Curated annotation (Swiss-Prot):
Residue runs in coiled coils: none
Family: Belongs to the ABC transporter superfamily. Carbohydrate importer 2 (CUT2) (TC 3.A.1.2) family.
CDD domains: ABC_Carb_Monos_I, ABC_Carb_Monos_II
Every ABC transporter domain range: 24-260, 270-510
UniProt membrane topology term: Peripheral membrane protein
InterPro entries (UniProt xref): AAA+_ATPase, ABC_carbohydrate_import_ATPase, ABC_transporter-like_ATP-bd, ABC_transporter-like_CS, P-loop_NTPase
Name of the protein in question: Putative ribose/galactose/methyl galactoside import ATP-binding protein 2
EC number: 7.5.2.11, 7.5.2.7
Reactions catalysed according to its record: D-ribose(out) + ATP + H2O = D-ribose(in) + ADP + phosphate + H(+); D-galactose(out) + ATP + H2O = D-galactose(in) + ADP + phosphate + H(+)
Ligand binding (ATP): G56, E57, N58, G59, A60, G61, K62, S63
GO cellular-component term (any): plasma membrane
Job of this protein: Part of an ABC transporter complex involved in carbohydrate import. Could be involved in ribose, galactose and/or methyl galactoside import. Responsible for energy coupling to the transport system.
Length: 513
């Protein structure tokens, strides 16, 4: 029997909740979107008092399944059971009232409302005159925070909080509904190491209270640290569920990608040509100074350094986003002035920014519109008019080459997985036929399979003579992909290491100097 959300909520409120080993299950679930099967005969089982991680490449179906379980989507086939009874969730509010809360990667709070107002919105306590009882709301919030060991002022406006503290408010809001199922989508993507540790303390405490937590992540170390068990999805299919302490990292990778990955960093020895880009004493007052390096055709120059070292600032200056205070930039031995992105593009330079959502993709536009932005002013203009046919053909070919998973180029970029969004951005710049490619954190926030694809693409570009500058915070990536590694600390270059001599210890010594 399948219960309506209202009936299920009433049963839950009465305390007569059906007993089951599992809090939440999905059986035979299928979900299609135009041209794409997002989920195909998927199953999932969440036990009480456990953290269950979901793993899989971008586009594997993890988020789609969670949106079904949270009432955002409705399955085309299959059944969802809550505490052993079938249920049809028609909306996120239905899910909340039945004890299922989802904390999205993009946090959903009202910035100009207080912490307390955000938590109790539409459920504010009222005084005997029917007005909001702010004093009682503060007390309720303080009691909730005490339970969760959260140290925040209930009266502060959310816009003044860090991302980590906003996440704490979201968790508190979910728990305030007496939720016993909590779904967390990439909760640590914008957190520092200390903030992650605090979040894990709260998750462990919630687990000890019998709450079941679904934890979507790309980070393998988090799975082993916080998850009791995990399920893997691939291409919209359920692959399997295992205890976290019974598998290795390589086991999980094999399950995720469906093949052995013996070489995550397919660096090849390619002929290194002449110097393409030469930077001398480049300075941006107050940010970095006297930065000097060369990059040759076919070379991958890795750039390493801790947060605040100035790596991204150097990239932005090279591309003309923030013009230098002093120093010189030369291309093919000829000094050039690059004080705008347009000038950089004219010199056949391309720049994949660190944050694909804020400074890269135009999320509300489709793939075609995103890909063509950098080339409309020149490459496909004839007699003052844009050749739409040629633009579309070039973008379709690039999409196939990069293996962007999409039914067509009219798909909005916001609907793509992180890895496919990154491919769209790379495709945008490859259409300009660059000679110098600057990549700032090219694989951040994407899954292991998509990372391997991007690494192969970068290697292919180097083989074709492109000079590549690759900024990365992932040490294995820097060591595995670079011909040389430039290390920065507090706005200065502290050393440049050849591939043969570079080790993690040497890089960290230079980065912390």
């Amino acid at each position: 029997m399948t219960l309506s959300p209202t009936t299920m909520a009433a049963v839950r409120a009465s305390g007569a909740v059906p007993k089951s080993e599992y809090l939440l299950t999905a059986e035979g679930v299928r979900k299609e979107f135009p041209g794409v099967v997002a989920l195909d005969d998927v199953e999932f089982k969440l036990k009480r008092g456990t953290v269950h991680a979901l793993m899989g490449e971008n586009g594997a179906g993890k988020s789609t399944l969670m949106k079904i379980l949270a009432g955002i989507y409705y399955p085309d086939q299959g059944e969802v059971k809550l505490r052993g009874a079938g249920i049809r969730l028609k909306s996120p509010l239905d899910a909340l009232e039945n004890g299922i809360a989802m904390i999205h990667q993009e946090l959903n709070l009202m910035p100009f409302m207080t912490v307390a107002e955000n938590i109790w919105i539409r459920r504010e306590p009222k005084n005997r005159f029917g007005f909001v009882d702010h004093g009682e709301m503060r007390r309720m919030t303080a009691k909730l925070f005490e339970r969760l060991k959260i140290d925040l002022d209930p009266e502060i406006e959310v816009r003044h909080l860090s991302v980590a503290n906003r996440q704490m408010v979201e968790i508190a809001k979910a728990v305030s509904y007496e939720s016993d199922v909590l779904i967390m989508d990439e909760p640590t993507s914008a957190l520092t190491e200390r903030e992650v540790a605090h979040l894990f303390e709260i998750i462990r405490d919630l687990r000890s209270q019998g709450i079941g937590i679904v934890y979507i992540t790309h980070k393998m170390n988090e799975l082993f640290e916080i998850a009791d068990e995990f399920s893997v999805f691939r291409d919209g299919k359920y692959i399997g569920t295992h205890l976290s302490n019974e598998v290795t990292r390589d086991d999980i990778i094999r399950m995720m990608v469906g093949r052995e990955i013996t070489q995550m960093f397919p660096k090849e020895e390619v002929p290194i040509g002449d110097v393409v880009l030469s930077v001398k004493n480049l300075t941006l007052n107050g940010v970095f100074r006297d930065v000097s390096f060369d990059v040759r055709a076919g070379e991958i120059l890795g750039v390493a350094g801790l947060v605040g070292s100035g790596r991204s600032n150097v990239a932005e200056t090279l591309f003309g986003v923030t013009p230098a205070s002093s120093g010189t930039i030369a291309i093919d031995g000829k000094e050039v002035v690059i004080d705008s992105a347009n000038k950089a593009i004219r010199h056949r330079m391309a720049f994949l920014t660190e944050d694909r959502k804020d400074t890269g993709c135009l999320l509300i536009l489709d793939i075609l519109e995103n890909m063509q932005i950098a080339v409309l002013q020149d490459k496909f203009v004839k007699r003052g008019f844009v050749s739409e046919r040629e633009v579309t053909a070039a973008c379709e070919e690039m999409s196939r080459k990069l293996r962007v998973k999409t039914p067509n180029l009219q798909e909005r970029v916001e609907n793509l997985s992180g890895g496919n969004q990154q491919k769209v951005l790379i495709g945008r710049w490859l259409l300009t036929n660059p000679r110098i490619l600057i990549l700032d954190e090219p694989t951040r926030g994407i899954d292991v399979g998509a990372k391997a694809e991007i690494h192969r693409l970068v290697t292919e570009l180097a083989r074709n003579g492109v000079a590549v500058i690759m900024i990365s915070s992932e040490m294995p990536e820097v060591l595995g992909m670079s011909d040389r590694i430039m290390v920065m600390h507090e706005g200065r270059v502290t050393g440049i290491l050849d591939r043969a001599e570079a080790t993690q210890i040497k890089v960290m010594e230079l980065a912390a100097r």
